[in-house]
């Protein structure tokens, strides 16, 4: 019985951290770390960067759920999450996640560098303060803060390797940030009734036409493409990464056009949501593999 209880708590903790999403963002961070010059660094440093990255992304995600637990209780998709369902103590979650974030910032500053710590703080402020606490329940423009937060792990990965936040760090961050609208809005379209019930003004809920949503996603895909080209021009990524990245950006643009043509169809949006996740993962996977191959043969 005790083992069953432990297993149940662990599953709830994993659910609180949205492990799949956390791992995707962690992968963008680690790819930026590898491409930014981290490949030749001691393996202990890799382990520290990955550990701190996972803890901070998971902690911020869980803290987001702490603040959203009331609206999660109103939405069919989220009402069985650990906090609205009452399986975990909100105060304990709050204390644990805030403590984990603070400790991670301190360790990032002392063990890696101040710029890595700064990226963690940026992600926290834009996700928890700007997106979740101030904007999400008030305006569809909350997506801007959410996008910056989504790009923070990649920003941190580059900063951890290069020891600075420069234009290439910003370009890496932009790739993820411009993917965020497609990630959130396609999902919000599929669960439109849930968001309406919880009175969360996501653009697919409040927009008079799906063209507004499609335009935002399409514009984001164009900026994503330009960011990838910028990294190639700066000799940060290779030609294979350039080709795959531009194709992915074009594919997301096509998803946006199709979304508009189908009038914001919920079932199509769910499929598009899954495709955009795979595309982001593919782009960063190719970047990492090309860098590793180049390092081995050089």
Curated annotation (Swiss-Prot):
Gene3D superfamilies linked to this entry: UbiA prenyltransferase
Chain segments annotated as transmembrane: 23-43, 47-67, 93-113, 115-135, 143-163, 169-189, 211-231, 236-256, 278-298
A GO molecular-function descriptor: protoheme IX farnesyltransferase activity
Keyword NAD annotated: no
Listed pathway(s): Porphyrin-containing compound metabolism; heme O biosynthesis; heme O from protoheme: step 1/1
One Pfam family matching this protein: UbiA
Topology relative to the membrane: Multi-pass membrane protein
Enzyme Commission number(s) from the entry: 2.5.1.141
Reaction catalyzed: heme b + (2E,6E)-farnesyl diphosphate + H2O = Fe(II)-heme o + diphosphate
One GO-annotated biological process of the protein: heme O biosynthetic process
EC category: transferase
GO cellular component: plasma membrane
HAMAP family, A to Z: CyoE_CtaB (MF_00154)
Similarity section: Belongs to the UbiA prenyltransferase family. Protoheme IX farnesyltransferase subfamily.
Additional remarks: Carbon 2 of the heme B porphyrin ring is defined according to the Fischer nomenclature.
Protein name: Protoheme IX farnesyltransferase
Gene that encodes the chain: ctaB
